[in-house]
Amino acid sequence: MAKTLNENGVETEIVSIGVKAMQGCIACNRCRELERCVFQDELYDRIRKQLEDGIDGLIVGSPTYYAGPNGSLCALLDRVFYSSSDLMKYKPAAAVTVCRRGGASATLDRLNKYFTINHMPVVSSQYWNIVHGMLPGDALQDAEGLQTMRMLGKNMAWLLENIAKEKKYPEIESAIRTNFIR
């Protein structure tokens, strides 16, 4: 997908968690005062800086574990999205997942929730943004999955180009926070 984005004039950078353990959000709300998460780590700082520097879009990928995204990724995304929600607005985003057989749609659902609660247009493809494989290199044999990724790259590039032309965003209303009791 990065190749397709690059061919369409979109600069890409891949940020990988790898095997790093991530601190999860503890809902201390200090980020509201500090305008950043209280927990310091290299990946959070790197992503936060990219957001502050004005990245135009975001693609988040994860393997599927027990019908959900990687736990370290969710811990990082919880912190990034909660502490940086104002920097996310109107940035096109897409989720991508890989799985052996099943659980990928639940993984996509979880990842897409980060985007939809932050005023981010979700970029789609010709099918769900999934490739199949179990071992490194297996996904390269998934012709349909690879085509889906190429189309996702083209759709992301198209949306980024059209947003850059217009740059007129809807006015956001102040949030009304309720719960199920009232």
Q: Where do the protein language model's features map onto the residues?
A:
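Conserved active-site and cofactor/substrate-binding residues in soluble primary-metabolism enzymes
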Residues: 20, 42, 71, 106, ...
